[in-house]
Amino acid sequence: MSMQSPVSVQLAPDSASTMVNCTIKSEEKKEPCHEAPQGAAPAVETQPGDPALASQDATNAKAPPQDCASPESSGSPEPKRPAASEAASGSQERLDFNRNLQEVVPAIEKLLSSDWKERFLGRSNVEAKDVKGTQESLAEKELQLLVMIHQLSALRDQLLTAHSEQKNMAAMLFEKQQQQMELARQQQEQIAKQQQQLIQQQHKINLLQQQIQQVNMPYVMIPAFPPSHQPLPVTPDSQLALPIQPIPCKPVEYPLQLLHSPPAPVVKRSGVAAHHPLQEPPQPLNLTAKPKVPELPNTSSSPSLKMNSCGPRPASHGAPTRDLQSSPPSLPLGFLGEGDAVTKAIQDARQLLHSHSGALENSPNTPFRKDLISLDSSPAKERLEESCVHPLEEAMLSCDMDGSRHFSESRNSSHIKRPMNAFMVWAKDERRKILQAFPDMHNSSISKILGSRWKSMTNQEKQPYYEEQARLSRQHLEKYPDYKYKPRPKRTCVVEGRRLRVGEYKALMRTRRQGARQSYTIPPQAGQAQVSSDILFPRAAGLPLARPLVEHYDPQGLDPNMPVIINTCSLREEGEGTDDRHSVADGEMYRYSEDEDSEGDEKSDEELVVLTD
């Protein structure tokens, strides 16, 4: 028996060993093979440690599942079908497992231990020993494998879904970025279009402003009409007869008719034609002087009075009463406002005129002052350009009202005027209206009236003038970007070692003149009046005086301590006589300049004053 047992094993290796291997394979698939012969099983059990058998088992374990089918066909026919079906299903599961394993190996390696591969592929001895275990252990292992397969498949599905979600999110983010970039580009295009439209609109506005300025550039001078409200005839040559529309302040009715009339010269001049107002260039408004439009000689008695104002005449005459009648006191004052301050200022001005004329009438030695109120102030430039026929006519033109100074219109070309403020814009037209109604009203009275009216106006009424002020300021800044306001210094003069201002100097001279008048012994004659007016009141354009008139004046009667103001223009034109030269040489010469006042009127650059002690 002992000799036959190994022989039987060696002789029938194909039958017994294959059946054992089939049994092992069936145990792995939860279907153990019980049809093995009884003689083969003890043979395997009696020699468990045989190396030949172990190697054979190892080779049979790696054999394909079709090897089990051939020995099973020779065995009993009962388990043939279940074994074949289980082998086919096992091979299919292994193929699926290998395919899934290749896909999810990187994720599995992180979850399992390092020796899982050897255990799973059966390369370790422990796996070989486990394979030979019981049916319960094999079933448990297979159950664990199935659970792991399901977990791996679920993990694979999760990874796939996460990957697809990431792709979708990336696509959505890219689309959002594209949309944002498109919106930003559209916004930039819209902003560029709007900026271009704004630039075009600004250009159009500038063009319109230039056109408006060109239309409103020439100032139309309104003539001062006589007190008789008769409309003057209009010639067909005057194509500019348009109603002047001032800036609206208060809706009032104006009784005067704003019509243009051809002017007539006041005095006949040789070789000089009468200037038509349509041919004159537009000139800035002189706020202190009266309008330069000449009056018709047949409409008022003031020209005839002006002819006799500075000439030789008897002492007793009725000129002041006629001059006062020339100013229209009966005009309605509706356009001047309804306030008490306005009417009070006008009444004060009239009382001042009456008192001044009465004082001049009572003083016998100053007949030349009686008609100074009714004289118009004409520019010195026109007087110098025009040739005079008679010295008395030129003297009439050169007399100024109440000693007021005349300034030449030809200022320095580099002088830049300041832009007008809101009050000046409003007062420009209002001053014209007041001068039309009251040609003889003094500038100070007009300023009081305008100031009281401006204070009584509301902010809503002042708003358009403030807007005009802003427009003029912008225009001035564009025209003169480097302009800087430099006020002129105050006028001062040194008298007897003291530096006095102009007001103090005038007050001092006034008191000294009043004291000097009392010491005069010369009878009041026209010649003396002419000389004294020329000496005491300097004029912008002096006239050569006749020698008998100069000799008629006695300088010995003056106070020796009183400085006398001598007109230097008349000194130059008289040929510089000996007495005058000595007075200029012995005297002190001072130059003082006029500071700009608030009304923006024209002033002379410098005035030469010669003081002799």
Curated annotation (Swiss-Prot):
Where is there biased composition of kind Acidic residues?
594-613
Region Disordered: what ranges?
A: 1-95, 276-329, 572-613
Give the DNA-binding residues.
416-484
Tell me where in or outside the cell this protein is found. Nucleus; Cytoplasm
The record's keywords, sorted A to Z, are: Cytoplasm, Differentiation, DNA-binding, Nucleus, Phosphoprotein, Repressor, Transcription, Transcription regulation
Mark the transmembrane ranges: none
- List, in alphabetical order, the Gene Ontology terms for molecular function in this entry: DNA-binding transcription repressor activity; DNA-binding transcription repressor activity, RNA polymerase II-specific; identical protein binding; RNA polymerase II transcription regulatory region sequence-specific DNA binding; sequence-specific DNA binding
Biased-composition ranges for Polar residues?
15-24, 297-307
Upon gene disruption, the observed phenotype is:
Mice show severe growth abnormalities. Severe reduction in the number of Rorc and Vgamma2-positive mature thymocytes in fetal and adult mice caused by the loss of Blk expression in Vgamma2-positive immature thymocytes. This results in a severe reduction of Il17a-producing Vgamma2-positive gamma-delta T-cells in the spleen, lymph nodes and dermis. In addition, the number of Vgamma4-positive thymocytes in the fetal thymus is transiently reduced, with levels returning to normal in neonatal and adult mice.
**Do the record's keywords include Phosphoprotein?**
yes
Region annotated Required for homodimerization, chain positions: 77-336
Q: What is this protein for, i.e. what is its function?
A: Transcription factor that binds to DNA at the consensus sequence 5'-AACAAT-3'. Binds to the proximal promoter region of the myelin protein MPZ gene, and may thereby be involved in the differentiation of oligodendroglia in the developing spinal tube. Binds to the gene promoter of MBP and acts as a transcriptional repressor. Binds to and modifies the activity of TCF7/TCF1, thereby inhibiting transcription and modulates normal gamma-delta T-cell development and differentiation of IL17A expressing gamma-delta T-cells.
Q: How does it assemble?
A: Homodimer; homodimerization reduces DNA binding efficiency. Interacts with isoform 2 of TCF7/TCF1 (via N-terminus); inhibits WNT-mediated transcriptional activity. Interacts with HHEX (via N-terminus); abolishes the SOX13-mediated inhibition of WNT-mediated transcriptional activity via competitive inhibition of the SOX13-TCF7 complex.
Q: What is this protein called?
A: Transcription factor SOX-13
Q: What is the lineage of its organism?
A: Eukaryota, Metazoa, Chordata, Craniata, Vertebrata
What gene, per UniProt, encodes this protein?
Answer: Sox13
